[in-house]
Regions:
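Short, small-residue-biased leader/transition segments that mark boundaries at the very start
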Residues: 1-3
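Short linear motifs in intrinsically disordered/low-complexity regions
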Residues: 9-11, 83, 190
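Periplasmic/extracytosolic POTRA-like scaffold domains at the N-termini of outer-membrane
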Residues: 10-40, 142-165
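A generic structural micro-environment signature
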Residues: 12, 34, 38, 60, ...
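A broadly tuned preference for mixed-charge, low-complexity surface segments
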Residues: 20, 112-132, 170-190
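Carbohydrate-recognition loop of C-type lectin domains
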Residues: 36-158, 210-211
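An aromatic-glycine-centered, glycine-rich loop/turn in mixed alpha/beta architecture
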Residues: 137-211
Length: 211
């Protein structure tokens, strides 16, 4: 008997898209530029990136004391890794943080995996729309361009640029102009510390008619 089709009435959740060619190439270049060997920092970074869904890694040697390594994760969207992703990476490198050499890490090396701490950004602004632009679509476009910017700087920059957010909004579909932008109630850059990643929170937009 040949099964031609199969359906599932329940929605599937918790999965990640297959690794893109671009992500694979970046991981390949990383391996060439930062050779992993004998459980060094680059090795832990490589092991974490081998797990589907991981988008970025920070490594902190001796984070929990002697013979320990802290591995901090973001996902492929630049968001702090959730518990399921953290657990898969933990199991891959050092199951249960026991240092028994049952994962990729060598015997006696205790690895502690966690997701980054979220730094939520609340945005408020006035937007002038282009003629015939629909507010709902413009709101979605604004959120998308800001999210893309935050993803691009996750784990690579220690601040969120107020000017870059303003510029990104101006490039959003349907936006003619933006004014009065505040980020977390201010008109300044937002500092991002180690083990942190910026995430987009509430976005409040006041609309005015375009010229």
């Amino acid at each position: 008997m040949c099964i031609r089709d199969r359906s599932n009435s329940d929605a599937l959740t918790g999965g990640y898209d297959a690794e893109t060619d671009e992500a694979y190439y970046e991981r390949y270049i990383l391996r060439l530029q930062t050779p992993p060997t004998s459980g060094n920092q680059y090795h832990y970074r490589l092991w974490a990136l081998e797990v589907t869904g991981v988008g970025g890694v920070q490594i902190y040697p001796l984070g929990h004391g002697d013979n320990t390594v802290d591995v901090v994760l973001i996902d492929v969207d630049g968001h702090p890794a959730d518990g399921e992703l953290v657990e898969r990476v933990q199991t891959h490198i050092d199951p249960g943080s026991k240092g028994l050499g049952e994962g990729e890490a060598p015997i006696g090396a205790y690895c502690y995996v966690s997701g980054a701490e979220a730094v939520e950004l609340t945005l408020s602004m006035t937007v002038q729309t282009l003629p015939d632009a629909e507010q709902e679509a413009v709101t979605a476009a604004v959120k998308a361009v800001v999210a893309d910017y935050l993803k691009s700087i996750a784990f690579t920059q220690n601040y969120v640029s107020y000017a870059r957010i303003n510029a990104a909004i101006l490039e959003a579909d349907g936006v003619q102009d933006v004014s009065g932008l505040t980020v977390n109630g201010a008109t300044a850059n937002v500092a991002i510390r180690e083990r942190q990643a910026a995430v987009l929170g509430e976005v409040s937009i006041r609309y005015g008619a375009g010229a």
